[in-house]
A protein has these predicted regions:
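Low-complexity, serine/threonine/proline-enriched polar segments
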Residues: 35-135
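Short, extreme N-terminal segment that most often corresponds to the first beta-strand
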Residues: 2-43, 159-169
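Short, well-ordered helical secondary-structure segments
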Residues: 2-4, 96, 118, 140
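Acidic, proline/glycine-rich low-complexity IDRs
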Residues: 4-10, 127-169
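Residue-level signal for the start and early helices of compact helical domains
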Residues: 6-8, 31, 60, 77, ...
Length: 169
């Protein structure tokens, strides 16, 4: 009966990243963010250490712009520079999406959605970023917030990864 249906499980990760070491007691965890009614996240859940390591490696090696970051330990990254190129690519992509928007297609779902995604999510992933090392922030953000964060870094800056959690949306 369900053979012809394609189910997509809508899970992704939230990464806590800071320029300061993060105490374990301040790690992002499954109870940090608002969930359920009124929140973006249906629910959040912890992941085990092996999955966490794989997710961090995936973030650095396949999601973040190539060469901009280097994994130097299980919990630390080095920012190598490259934000100017990322910003140029970002602006070019937003312009491309904006040029595709016309009076004829502006009310169609895809054209405005893709432009909005290009603006808010330059990495084009479902990963979110929690940029608070103290664990007090009540929200995580899409990749534009991470891009803004990186704009304030100097090459060679060490970044610390705290909690990494799964979320369902």
């Amino acid at each position: 009966m369900f053979d012809n249906l394609k189910f997509t499980i809508m899970h992704s990760r939230i990464f806590q990243i800071s320029t300061e070491p993060i105490d374990k007691e301040n790690y992002l965890n499954e109870n940090t963010l608002q969930q359920g009614d009124g929140g973006f996240y249906d629910y959040c859940s912890e992941i085990d250490d092996d999955v966490r390591k794989e997710d961090i490696a995936n973030l650095v090696n396949y999601v973040l712009p190539k060469g901009m970051f280097e994994l130097i330990s299980d919990d630390t990254l080095r920012y190598n520079g490259g934000i100017e190129q990322w910003k140029e690519e970002y602006v070019a992509n937003v312009k491309k999406k904006a040029e595709a928007l016309t009076v004829d297609n502006m009310l169609e779902w895809g054209s405005t959605y893709y432009l909005k995604q290009a603006v808010e999510n330059p990495l084009d992933v479902a990963y979110h970023f929690y940029l608070d090392g103290d664990g007090c922030q009540a929200f995580a953000e899409q990749s534009f917030a991470f891009m803004e964060f990186v704009c304030g870094l100097e090459p060679g800056t060490t970044l610390y990864i705290g909690g990494v959690i799964d979320y369902h949306f």
